[in-house]
Amino acid sequence: MKKLKKLFAVMLSLVMVLAMGITSFADTNSATITLTGFSEADKVEYMQIIQKDETKSSGWAFANNAGACFTEAFGLVDSDDTQQQVIWGLIQYQDKNVKLPNGVTAEEATAAKIDLALSKVAALTGFSKATNKESIEVNAAGVYAIKAEETGFTYKTATAYVGFGEPYPTLTNAAVTAKKSPTSVDKTVADEDHVVAIGDIVTYTIEAYVPFIDAANTKDRTFTITDKITGADYYLTGPNSVSSVTMEGKDDQVGTINVNDDGKGFTIDLNSLVADTDNPNAGKKITVTYTAKVKEITVENKAGSHAAGVDYGADNEPVKLFTGELVLLKYGDGNVNNSLANAEFVLYKDGEEAPLTFVKENNGKYKYAPNTEDASATLVTDKNGMIDVEGLDVGSYHFEETKAPKGYSINTDGKTLTLTVDGEVATANLYNEGGLNDTKLSALPATGGIGTTIFTIVGCGIMIAAAGLFFASRRKENR
């Protein structure tokens, strides 16, 4: 019995070697492993991997085929002897001052070897499903492997050590905290109401997390972040541009945004962050910030990631941006059914001195086109008396008439229309419409008619007749 107690005392140093938790005294024949951070898991499973065995030099032995996983991870040929060497190595890993009994050899343990072994253990059959995600009840001393699954997260296989207390063979309780990394990829845009104008430069942010990749996976240690965009062009260089890939705890850039050949997406290679099987970066947040220039009336953007052969973010909702549309109806004589074609306007945004410029599309609409060479400020009503402009941001806009249709006068009042968001965030393109009446030209006094001509002719006739009578009477007198 003394020998056994000595062995058990030595094994107490194994506590915490494999992420073992705080222990407390339990009932003689049972112990509780308290679980922290597992409550949201879809499934929690556990299995004993080291058990008491007085026939072994350490007093412990691997259980449920876990020994082969450890010897393989430690680079040893599997046998009872090599398994004992691994167990003694685990003891010394925790306490370098432990003195080994004569004739005992310990295989050096490292964090990488332990993680590799546990990743192999996780693939074994024989795990039991925990009915309670906050605690597990066990009735034997030893080391227990605990694994979990949760949509949107990867879990590192955890271990808990249930030891012996006083009086022997009282079992001690244990506690273990989950170590998990989100696989989610979150996308946001700086424009809070999600309404922009064509030509605007908008800033996007992607947040993702370095995944935990099993140490056993040495061939496919990959991690990339991807992005797809429609309705805008990536704007990574130039005034007010942003292109940044950072990781928490590190000042320098950890990656570069590489735009695809078609310009509709990009990829960021972050393989270097997961190359180490020790997973030192697992769970650290990656922040990608970049700018894009709006070119269409709607913009759709979606991010994802790829880690160890698995794609994440496929179910993410894309981030959408919208623009506004204004429609003006030009009519005459107070009758909205009397639409007027060929009226000309310019459009001003409230607070700006220069009129906005547009390009006319094949569908007859005018698309906002700032700083575009072939754009024009002139807007002309179509055969239906309509002007339809799109690609505008929220705000008030004023239509100023510059040329009235033939036979009508300019309405100097113009028309002001406003684009507003219904709620905090737009869910569709904004729209507003209004009409503007023109009146016919007023009648002016006629010119170029007979006027006084008839009177002039009559007067001249009278004068000629009078002159004739005068000369006739003179001639008569002379006779």
State where each predicted segment sits:
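Solvent-exposed loop/turn and edge beta-strand elements of beta-rich ligand-binding domains
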Residues: 2-479
